[in-house]
Every structure is written in structure tokens, then in C-alpha cells.
Amino acid sequence: MKVIEVQYLHKQFNGLVAVDSISFSVEKAEFFGLLGPNGAGKTTTIRMLYGFLPSTRGSIQLFGMDIHRDWRRIKARIGVCQQDNTLDPDLTVEQNLHVFAEYFSIPKSEALRRGVELLDFFALSHKKDAKVMELSGGMARRLILARALINQPDLLILDEPTTGLDPQSKHQVWEKLETLKGAGLTALITTHNMEEASRLCDRLIIIDHGNILVEGRPRELIAHYAGTNVVEVEDAGQEFREYVKLNHIEHDDLGRRMVLYCPDGSDLDHTVRERFCTAKCIYRNSTLEDVFLRLTGRELRE
């Protein structure tokens, strides 16, 4: 069953195309990633998906319902975890959950029960009476996630769920999301963290300039666009560049540094060290970040 079905979604702002007739779908119990550099069209797409922004044309269906005609019914079945901290600083941790539950007309006794369960799940029970200002960044992020789940949604939309968190807090959030994934929750995730996307997403798309560049499973995309291994060579000279060209090795030439992509880089690593001993060579596994940079470029986006 398709939880999300987007067909030819298009958005223009004063003649500027932000999203250019994209189509994709998300299956039930799937974690689906939406990746792209700044200004690629991710946020615009997400805002159209949860009804904050009308599309110029195209269609969006959630749970088989049209987002424009059936928005009230759809809204009751989704949870949204925004990148910004939108918690009420004047309320306690527990009160933030209860107030949000009122938006969904959840009975008070049920809201109390769900609040207890969610605070326990996200390891926040000991902070239930604390004000939001007293929470660490990781705790606040977990509370935002808990709040997004108060209506027991069938679809969770996560906008940069771990941005700004330290490694410990980040991994704790990932573990909680993996537990929810194992329980059958469907999620749409936007993230700049390639490790996060590789770890959580069953499938993903990479979008740039409003267009979908690729779609697939993380490991398959890595194998196709970046091989199995990467060899990074510093101070690459002309002789080495000719060697790469003659042997038709997939690569990015970054000036003094070359990045080589290969199905098995071990032999290449040995060759570089043997024949080009002056070169500094790093041998590592290919990652989703390699794919992302190959497809979207390395120029800074602001």
C-alpha cells in the first residue's frame, strides 16, 4: 500500500521553479529519504506534503486521499517533526505533550496515558516536570519527536531530525527511530547527514534544482555511482593523472587531490603506493556522501 503518492508535483514562486514536476511514492512501513543541497527544493516539497504550501500543479495523495479535499482526515494521521524547536518554553515537558494532544481532540485520560508511554520511550520521564528551557539539545529533540507521535500517526515526517546534536544524542535518536521503524511506522526523512540516511532509509531520492537526480536503496546507489571503495590521492602529479586516464578509472579531479572510485580499490591502492610513492594515499569504503557529492557537485550552497 502506498502511504505517499506524488505525481508531477510542481511549484513556482514568481516564475522561479522550486520543484519541477517530480514524482515518487512511499510504501507502508518504509523509511524514505529526501536528500539534496540547500535550495534544492526539499523544504518546499515537504511543506506541500504536510499542507503548509499549495502546489502550482500536480497531485499529492496520502493514504489514498487527496491532500486538498481530505486534509482534515489526513492531518489526524500524520506527525510532523520540524527542524526548528517549536516547543512552548513556558510549559513543562509533560504539558507540551498534553497541549498538543488537544489539537487532535484526544481525551485527557488518553493523552495522559500516551504522554507517560512516550516520555518513558524517549527516556524523558525524569524531566516531565521540567521547563523546556532546562532541557539539553538532545532532550528537546526527543521531546519534539514524542510530541509528533502523540496522535499515534501512520506517517511521520522528519525534517532534519538530528541537526545540531552531539554524536551521543544523535545515536540515541537514531536508535529510537529504528525501534519505531521495526514496529511498522512509515516515515519521510529530510536530512543533510549522509550517515543518517544510509542507516535509516530503505530508499531515498536525491533532488537538486527541483529535479530528482536518482532514486534507490542507499547501498545500491553507492555501488552504482561510487563503487565499493574510494582511493583519495593527495599531490597527484601529471604522471598519475595520465595513468588514471589511460586506465579509464572513474574519478573526480579536485586540483591537488584526486578521488578515485572503483569496484575493488585494494589493487589500485597498492599500485598507487608502488608506482607513485610520492603520493599520499587514503583507501576507504565508498559512502553515500560520495554519491551525493558526485551528483550535486562540491560547490558551497548558501
Which residues does each PLM region occupy?
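Helix-to-loop junction immediately C-terminal to a conserved catalytic motif
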Residues: Y50
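Conserved ABC transporter NBD signature motif
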Residues: G58-R69, R73-I74
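Conserved ABC ATPase signature
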Residues: D90, K131-L135
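Conserved ABC ATPase "signature" region
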Residues: H98, E102, S109-K127
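Conserved catalytic motifs of ABC-family nucleotide-binding domains
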Residues: Q152
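Catalytic Walker B motif of ABC-type/P-loop ATPase nucleotide-binding domains
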Residues: L156-D159
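ABC transporter nucleotide-binding domain
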Residues: W174-P263
